[in-house]
Amino acid sequence: MSFSGGGYRAATFDLGTLSFLNSIHLDGGRTLLDCVVALSSVSGGTIPAMRYMLARARGEGVDKMVEELFGFLCNEDLMTDALQRLSNEKANRDASSIKIMAEIYDRLLFGNSTMADIIDNFDRNPVKDYTALATDFDNSLPFRFRLTEGKMSDGSRMTYGVFGNQKHSIGRSVVRHITPGEAMACSSCYPSGFEPMMYPDDFQVMRHDELVSGIKSRFGLMDGGLVDNQGIEPILLAEERMRKYRADKSRTDKALDLIIVSDVSSPYMEGYAPSEQALPDSVGRLTLGRLRNYGLISEVVVMLLFIVALVLGSNFWLGVMSVILAIVTLANIIGAVLKSKMFAAIRKTFVGDRAAFISHLKFATIEAMLMNRAKSVIMMSSEIFFKRMRQLNYGAIYDDKEWHNRVVSSTVYELRPGERWESMKRNGTLADYLAPSEAVQQNSALAASMGTTLWFTAEEKAQGMPQALLAAGQYGMCHNLLDYIDAIEKDGTNLTEGHRLLVSCKPQLLAAWQKFQENPRWMVPDVTRS
């Protein structure tokens, strides 16, 4: 299972996915969640994933963990806490907001635990391969905070913490001292909101002199969504490893029966439109050349008035004109210096010696050029780049015939009004009972409307946004598992015993879906603080 990035939108939706899988029971006291052996997370999705890994290590009940984490997401004001901490920091250029966020996560969410707490209790966890994904800002490669279980030559099991990539890695002795909050902060460190988290400077290993002395490389880490916002690549790596080391060497099919992708990103985007003029028309018609002429004219006029006051012998007007003349002259000098520096900077770009032509451009034209370029760059980095990466990530599994009948995706937007389910219902590829009710559609529309932030605003809380997102993750997983079971009942190729186990859960899924149709939030716990 992979949890996508997307701030609190992803964290809450993915938590809903996790909680629903834990509600479907199998024989022997297990749940569907207990069948998840490989887990990856990116950015906001790392919040529920890392907390789940620690809960398993501590032997905590999953339902209790879900309720506590949902309360944390709904009620804790992390940004205010972080800003207060940042303002109290001693004034220095190394003050780091992401380091402070990591410390807050560790204190409020993880109880000041370390990776050693998860590693030493890995046998309690059904997940045998977990990766929290970040991006190495030294070489643009994925940086994996990866925990795996392996076998020793004598048959005993050993848990490994493999943190890094082909260029940078963190030694195993140091891995034990990395905290869950630090890994989570790196994974969710979005460029527009935070600076890179520097290793080892911003990590608690700096408190251990014996560890720091052996660290040779220094590098920055940021949001894993920059390289893989769906977290699919770590799952494929986990599958390769499991296939290599599985007991039955005669099997050649995939080692994983099913990949579940819990995803809050969207394939849709608004098309580009030029920005509208913000400058008043009177200002927009000006040019740098005309502004310079106005400055010179005003200086001449003030100088003439100064001479008139001098001839008339008026000390009052002489004083007033002296002050005005000084101000106008100073303004012209400052303007000339700034213009000279601006042109010098522009000449270093592709414009070169043609910089002088800018003097003839109207301010409205300059505004349009700057705003439209800024808008297109932001759109390219925050929309087009991520949409294309999403297509490539999904293509890695959906375009591979070996994954046929082994992929389920659950997305936050798919059950809104006007989505693909409507055309599927019309052409008969979606069972009538899976058409979402009006209540489910409206809840999905609300859930999908949230932006990518690491908090819920007061307005969003008043709207019930956290509850809508948790519910969307729950009924979305239910809906997609039912749709998947319908599909494999018609096409039984590339299936295993694990799929028959999933099909046996259909009565529970049907009962839950009927409840969701009537009340989409029937599974959402009440965590409202009085």
Map each language-model feature to its residues.
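Catalytic domains of lipid- and phosphate-ester/thioester hydrolases
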Residues: M1-S530
